Regions:
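A short, glycine/Asx- and small/polar-enriched loop/turn
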Residues: 176-182
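OB-fold/S1-family RNA-binding modules
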Residues: 29
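Tandem CBS (Bateman) regulatory domains
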Residues: 1-12, 50-86, 90-100, 111, ...
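Cytosolic beta-strand hydrophobic patch enriched in CBS
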Residues: 16-18, 35-49, 85-86, 104-119
């Protein structure tokens, strides 16, 4: 899936400019109940500013606390190492950036470095819920030996017994083992009958 499918376009995003004062940024963050706000000016992305960053600077670095909110500007406090990504990049790449940089969002820009919008953790999380069908069908968790043909065999059993496979995920156990956990979301009139057929085929239900 491409980033452009999940991104939030700039038209629906509240931003601040590098020259805005800290009070304006903080007021927006509080009013809109946001974690952070993109810093943008004339379609160029500069970074982000968050409540945490504002307070951190105030308590640890600010030389004049009395005039901080009014006189200090966003570019003094903003985070500048926010990753950027192209709209036609894969969502998996974007997800890796979000985890690696520990940022609430990544900026989406075009080849001319023009700001197009943002992609958030929430957007990716919600898409995963939809793709995995977590609100649909029933969950079947199967322990299978890590040998060729197991997935095909399991799929055939489910299909031949009236099951409609919504999603199919093989979970990596993160340790060296000869078995894998396969989680299947199934829609069926007789789910219990499918479970019994899976057991009869030698699979273990977890």
């Amino acid at each position: 899936m491409f980033v452009k499918s999940l991104m939030m376009g700039k038209e629906s995003i509240i931003t601040v400019s590098p020259k805005d004062n800290i009070r304006k940024a903080l007021d927006i963050i509080k009013k809109e109940n946001l974690l952070s706000v993109p810093v943008v000016y004339e379609d160029k992305f500069y970074g982000s500013i968050s409540k945490d960053k504002i307070y951190e600077y105030y308590f640890e670095e600010c030389p004049n606390k009395e005039s901080y909110l009014e006189d200090f500007i966003v570019e003094k406090v903003m985070k500048t190492d926010v990753p950027e990504i192209f709209p036609m990049s894969q969502v998996e790449e974007a997800a890796n950036y979000l985890v690696t940089y520990r940022t609430p969002f990544i900026a989406v820009v075009d080849r001319d470095d023009k700001f197009l919008g943002i992609l958030t953790h929430k957007a990716i999380f919600n898409e995963n819920i939809d793709v995995l069908g977590l609100n649909k069908g029933k969950r079947l968790s199967v322990i299978a030996y890590d040998i060729k043909g197991q997935i095909s065999k399991l799929s055939k059993i489910i299909s031949e017994n009236g099951g409609d496979i919504i999603s199919f995920v093989v979970i990596d156990p993160k340790v060296k083992t000869d078995v894998k956990e396969i989680v299947v979301r199934v829609r069926a009139n007789d789910f219990d009958a499918i479970v019994e057929k899976v057991k009869e085929a030698g699979f273990r239900i977890s």
